[in-house]
Swiss-Prot record:
Its EC number is 3.5.1.110. This is Ureidoacrylate amidohydrolase RutB. Hydrolyzes ureidoacrylate to form aminoacrylate and carbamate. The carbamate hydrolyzes spontaneously, thereby releasing one of the nitrogen atoms of the pyrimidine ring as ammonia and one of its carbon atoms as CO2. It comes from Escherichia coli O157:H7. The active site is at 24 (proton acceptor), 133, 166 (nucleophile). One of its GO terms (biological process) is nitrogen utilization. Transmembrane segments: none annotated. GO terms for molecular function: hydrolase activity, acting on carbon-nitrogen (but not peptide) bonds, in linear amides. The lineage of its organism: Bacteria, Pseudomonadati, Pseudomonadota, Gammaproteobacteria, Enterobacterales.
């Protein structure tokens, strides 16, 4: 068992019965010219987050944790996004951006597009699981719950973008399904101003889970290896 120093208190878990979840580290969310950038969100400080995710993934894999990668998006015709009868049609900033800029239709979060692809620095390895998801939460209309339960996994460590949207949504849904969720705060980034990052982390550590950081996580998994991994 491993004890991880976290807020509001330490949490103990078995790495081999836990998963590291990388949420939507796609060009859409982390790269200039991607959806968030085109929609007016600041992605200029995502590079350190990518590096921290690399470090966390390396440590988690070495400790025997399952690595799960999510890619958010829809088919090229956006049928999976829902039509006017879906609130997603009205609230998705990607869909709204394409309605305002028709030349982007078919380019944002469409499966097979550059926007949909994971960033170059983050590459799933054999044994990892890659899942598409059509909404903010990784539990909605995906096999995530059955994948985890079939492996006896109850502890989930979250990284990625956006803390206040897909990361928090997935962690909250996991909480309702009796999963223990931890966020590595320096391996996440918000969509919006800095205060929403702080608000999301406050919500998580106060109501739904735990908050730690990459160095503490790596040191808990293997106290002598963090310097080498980093």
């Amino acid at each position: 068992m491993t004890t991880l120093t976290a807020r509001p208190e330490a949490i103990t878990f078995d790495p081999q019965q836990s998963a590291l979840i990388v949420v939507d580290m796609q060009n859409a969310y982390a790269t200039p010219g991607g959806y968030l950038d085109l929609a007016g969100f600041d992605v200029s400080t995502t590079r350190p987050v990518i590096a921290n995710i690399q470090t966390a993934v390396t440590a988690a894999r070495a400790a025997g944790m399952l690595i799960i990668w999510f890619q958010n998006g829809w088919d090229e015709q956006y049928v999976e996004a829902g039509g006017p009868g879906s609130p997603n049609f009205h609230k998705s900033n990607a869909l709204k951006t394409m309605r305002k800029q028709p030349q982007l239709q078919g380019k944002l979060l469409a499966k097979g597009s550059w926007d949909y692809q994971l960033v170059d620095e983050l590459v799933p390895q054999p044994g990892d699981i890659v899942l598409p998801k059509p909404r903010y939460s990784g539990f909605f209309n995906t096999p995530l719950d059955s994948i985890l339960r079939s492996r006896g996994i109850r502890h989930l460590v979250f990284t990625s973008i956006a803390t206040n949207v897909c990361v928090e949504s997935t962690l909250r849904d996991g909480f309702f399904l009796e999963y223990f969720g931890v966020v590595l705060e320096d391996a996440t980034h918000q969509a919006g101003p800095e205060f929403v990052q702080k608000a999301a982390l406050f919500n998580i550590e106060t109501f739904f889970g735990w908050v730690s950081d990459v160095e503490t996580f790596c040191d808990a998994l293997s106290p002598t290896s963090f310097a080498r991994i980093a």
